[in-house]
Amino acid sequence: MKTQMNYAKEGIFTKEMQIVAQKENLSKDFLLENIACGKIIIPANINHKSLDPNGIGFGLRTKVNVNLGVSNDCVDYSEEMKKVELAHKFGIEAIMDLSNYGKTSRFRDELVNVSKAMIGTVPVYDAVGFLEKDLKQINAKDFLDVVYHHAKSGVDFMTIHAGINSRAAHIFKQSKRLTNIVSRGGSVLYAWMMMKDAENPFFEYYDDLLDICLKYDVTLSLGDALRPGSTHDASDGAQISELIELSLLTQRAWDVGIQVMIEGPGHMAINEIEANMQLEKRLCKGAPFYVLGPLVIDIGAGYDHISGAIGGAVAAASGADMLCYVTPAEHLRLPNLEDVREGIVATKIAAHAGDIAKLPKERARDDEMSKARQEIDWEKMFKLAIDGEKAKKMFNERRPDDLNSCSMCGKMCAMNTMNQILKGEDVSLA
């Protein structure tokens, strides 16, 4: 099976590439060159028939991922499908099913069937439920069996924590972290490695993993099991040692034509973000970077979507290619629909802020909004806003008598005052 990367290396412009080129207003040659060298990816499993393809990487708009899925405390697949609908409403490009309880295949199959967004999973979450074995009973090849079933079902990308091998684990043991390993998948694999006194199965059988990805054109999202879970732990030896391992694994995947993106932090002080983005790009030769946040403080419980948006904006401006959304429920509970909405909007704001910095053409929509404000064209403002529905609702809650203003300024509206005086008209504030 040929992948998008293999086609690009042969100069073949696939239908998925054509769609991405049109969406991003990019040339055929630019896309082919950057997909061939791994700087742009188009996650597109051959079995995901409802997919509306999007590209991630160099020269493209920053994409946003929404996480959803059930846990053993909250098993309501109907609510999770409502989250999918909400993600589609806001034009989200990627959705990850992080279900970690029970038999998840039915929900995943439905998700692949209905979602036009690319779908990602973390197969290790599904191992216990799928295999009906406790963690210690699972053998190395069992994990690959789970990966195969996810790939066959149509998943476009998978988080695989192959970088936490015995070398990285040794460095982690020597670290003096406040929050140890905060990656769910990473903690499960580390526990398995310690209990079995064995190498990480995804690292040991990496070539077998690549064969599965090659068969279905699954993109590898190389997970950062040792990402910092606190600002104290950011940029430490454990995090960087794993990133070096991921850079080596990236090249091995590229050698056979597998598309790759790298997952990143996490929690990180704002002054460390830019350097971390540059380090990933340097070590991993420009592979797309997919970051969670980063959250710039650790005390924002209930408001972590704001902390994540601040970090995400800096990350995107500094080269991050996809942001994983963070909701107000982060660290507290499974998010509800309102949490998901707030997380989506906050992260889209962060992504767009980053795009204005690195892709100046992306300011066009903002310029249109500024013109609409100057012209006091409310309907156009609502249409251009990231969340126009909320903007219109708030406006109407205290609707002014004079629509040439809002209830904040009334007759003292600066826009209206300047519009009148520049036309040579008198201004009356009485």
From Swiss-Prot:
* Entry's cofactor comment: Binds 1 [4Fe-4S] cluster per subunit. The cluster is coordinated with 3 cysteines and an exchangeable S-adenosyl-L-methionine.
Catalytic class of the enzyme: lyase
**GO BP annotation list:** thiamine biosynthetic process; thiamine diphosphate biosynthetic process
Q: Which reaction does it catalyse?
A: 5-amino-1-(5-phospho-beta-D-ribosyl)imidazole + S-adenosyl-L-methionine = 4-amino-2-methyl-5-(phosphooxymethyl)pyrimidine + CO + 5'-deoxyadenosine + formate + L-methionine + 3 H(+)
Taken from the UniProt record, the cysteine pairs bridged by disulfide bonds within this chain are none
What does the entry list as the binding residues for substrate? N67, M96, Y125, H161, S183, R184, G185, D224, A225, L226, R227, E263, Y290
Q: Which UniProt keyword terms apply here? A: 4Fe-4S, Iron, Iron-sulfur, Lyase, Metal-binding, S-adenosyl-L-methionine, Thiamine biosynthesis, Zinc
The pathway that the record names for this protein is: Cofactor biosynthesis; thiamine diphosphate biosynthesis
The residues the record assigns to binding Zn(2+) are H267, H331
The molecular function GO annotations come to: 4 iron, 4 sulfur cluster binding; carbon-carbon lyase activity; zinc ion binding
**Has the keyword Acyltransferase been applied to this entry?**
no
Q: Which domain of life is it from?
A: Bacteria
Pfam families per record: ThiC_Rad_SAM (PF01964)
Q: Which GO terms describe its cellular component?
A: cytosol
Q: Which InterPro entries match?
A: ThiC, ThiC/Bza_core_dom, ThiC/BzaA/B
What cofactor is this protein dependent on? [4Fe-4S] cluster
EC numbers: 4.1.99.17
Q: At which positions is [4Fe-4S] cluster bound? A: C406, C409, C413
Family to which this protein belongs: Belongs to the ThiC family.
Known function: Catalyzes the synthesis of the hydroxymethylpyrimidine phosphate (HMP-P) moiety of thiamine from aminoimidazole ribotide (AIR) in a radical S-adenosyl-L-methionine (SAM)-dependent reaction.
Q: How does it assemble?
A: Homodimer.
Q: Which PANTHER family match?
A: PHOSPHOMETHYLPYRIMIDINE SYNTHASE, CHLOROPLASTIC (PTHR30557:SF1), THIAMINE BIOSYNTHESIS PROTEIN THIC (PTHR30557)
User: What is the designated name of this protein?
Assistant: Phosphomethylpyrimidine synthase
